[in-house]
Amino acid sequence: MTSHTIFRNRYRHAHLRPAMLGLLLSGCSTLASVGADTFTLEGELPADFALKAQAHYGGAESCSGRGHVETFKEDYEKAPHGYRFEVPVSYRDGICDLQLVRVGLFIYGRYGEKDWQETYDNGELLVVAKATAEDGNNLHGHPAPIHSECSWLFQESKLNLGISKILSCKGAGARLNRKQLRLQTIILSFTVNPREEPYRDNTWIEFPEGWRPCLPKEGWQQCQDPPVFKTYKNNNKECTIYPNCTE
């Protein structure tokens, strides 16, 4: 409803009460968070990691068509660093109360300076009306800290330009109790496993010096049996083993 419509109706119906007019005007108000109705999401990120959190809000049945997304970001840094987001638990859209439904997580990592040497994995904080003891982070009192371990999985790049990596972060999520969420601090920290492994099983074979790539079986991706080893390119060099290139 536009302001022109409101005031046109006001002149047609002079008997409108001020309280009713205020209600109509509130129906056209801008989206706003509700006071101190927030929780804190904070934690630690490794060097060369970034984090984006997208809070998704939805309305009740009478406002089922309404929704809102709020985005929070922590950029890359060369050293380990912390982040802290103040996330509203609810928003008001006119006469509709929009409640936090979930927080989508995008965990970014980079392993080089080139544009293609950046990737991400996903996580999620799901807000539920009633959580169970199995959820772990929803018991009475302060929620337990959440720890996610990220691993780098390597492979030959599709264009044979070098080694490309895929980021895999385990445990980047939880179920949060809506009633216990207000004014709480949820701690979600990330670490990196120093051990890298191949993205696909049985495509590289591990030796004490590192990983050696092997030729695949015909029509398959896995190594031949017995394995036949090959070279690969990385940083404009012909390499036989990863990560040191040469034995």
Predicted segment positions?
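A eukaryote-biased signal for long
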Residues: 131-247
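C-terminal motif of bacterial Sec signal peptides marking the signal peptidase cleavage site
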Residues: 26-27
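Sec-dependent signal peptide recognition
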Residues: 12-22
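Structured domain cores in non-transmembrane regions
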Residues: 51-162
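Short, solvent-exposed beta-strand/turn "edge" segments of beta-rich domains on protein surfaces
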Residues: 30-34
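N-terminal secretory signal peptides that target proteins for export/translocation
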Residues: 1-12
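Structural motif
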Residues: 39-50
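Alpha-helical and His/Cys-centered functional microenvironments
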Residues: 8, 19, 210
